[in-house]
């Protein structure tokens, strides 16, 4: 287990697609569980595109200061790091169909970590 954790930590630093794949799988699984539903199908089917296409899509929405090196970083300051954010929060889902639609790639955006964690949270802004 220690080896696996160290391996994944190192791979996250060197292979951004590996990092995206892990984070998106966890993000989608957790959002479905929070609404008391079960994940049915593969992550890419729910997402609506491959992980490579998702990476390209997110990069097309980057602000000038965003890159994969500052993804997930947070120190309480604006424009320090960014998170993957659901544009329409999954907490607003009222049904299984809605939660699946809200996990489509087109409902994701890169958002400043400060804005996402302090201002937006589970709100639509």
Predicted regions and their residues:
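Intrinsic structural disorder
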Residues: 58, 124-125
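Short Cys/His-rich local motifs and their 1-3 flanking residues in nucleic-acid-associated proteins
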Residues: 117
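Histidine-centered nuclease catalytic patch
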Residues: 66-110, 121-123
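Contiguous alpha-helical segments
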Residues: 1-83
């Amino acid at each position: 287990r220690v080896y696996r954790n160290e391996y994944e930590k190192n791979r996250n630093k060197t292979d951004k697609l590996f990092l995206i794949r892990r984070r998106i799988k966890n993000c989608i699984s957790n959002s479905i569980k929070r609404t008391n539903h079960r994940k049915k199908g593969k992550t890419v089917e729910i997402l609506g595109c491959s992980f490579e296409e998702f990476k390209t899509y997110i990069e097309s929405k980057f602000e000038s200061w965003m890159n994969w090196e500052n993804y997930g970083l947070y120190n309480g300051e604006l424009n320090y790091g960014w998170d993957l954010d659901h544009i329409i929060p999954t907490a607003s889902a009222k049904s299984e169909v809605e939660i699946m639609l809200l996990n489509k790639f087109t409902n994701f955006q890169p958002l400043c970590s400060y804005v996402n964690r302090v201002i937006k949270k589970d709100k639509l802004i």
